[in-house]
Design a protein with these regions (language model features):
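Glycosyltransferase specificity loop/lid
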Residues: 1-128
């Protein structure tokens, strides 16, 4: 019987990526094969832990400096919203985060089907 393949799809951020590494390591200790779908900006993180990576662009490709500026501006622009109640954040921070999640899903649809066909996972784990 061959090992079950678990495909990890962490958000393109170190917290979710490293969380997936820990879960993937535990899976491999139990005889599973772990593979990771990663965004270009996180490429190399999972390989550094010995996992097979499959890059799927989650946004329009841009130089690292431009991507860093985008996220810095996004967070800095929302700092005042973090003083608001969760309810008051719905029309600003929550809405913009949701729109970003939808945009990443649209971008992922361009390459993700090919990765899923190549990997043929038995289980998919998503960390958003």
């Amino acid at each position: 019987m061959s090992a079950k393949t678990i495909a990890f799809f962490p958000e393109a951020a170190f917290g979710p990526a490293l969380n997936s590494v820990g879960v993937a390591q535990a899976g491999e200790q139990r005889g599973r094969t772990a593979v990771v779908r990663t965004d270009e900006g996180m490429s190399g993180v999972d390989e550094g832990y010995g996992f097979s990576e499959h890059v799927v662009n989650m946004s329009e490709p841009m130089p690292p400096e431009e991507m860093a500026k985008y996220w810095t501006d996004f967070i800095n622009g929302h700092i005042p919203n973090f003083d608001l109640s969760a309810y008051e954040q719905i029309d600003n921070y929550v809405k913009e985060c949701w729109e970003a999640i939808v945009d990443t899903a649209i971008w992922a649809e361009k390459e993700l089907p090919g990765v899923l066909e190549t990997v043929s996972p038995d289980i998919v784990v998503v960390d958003r």
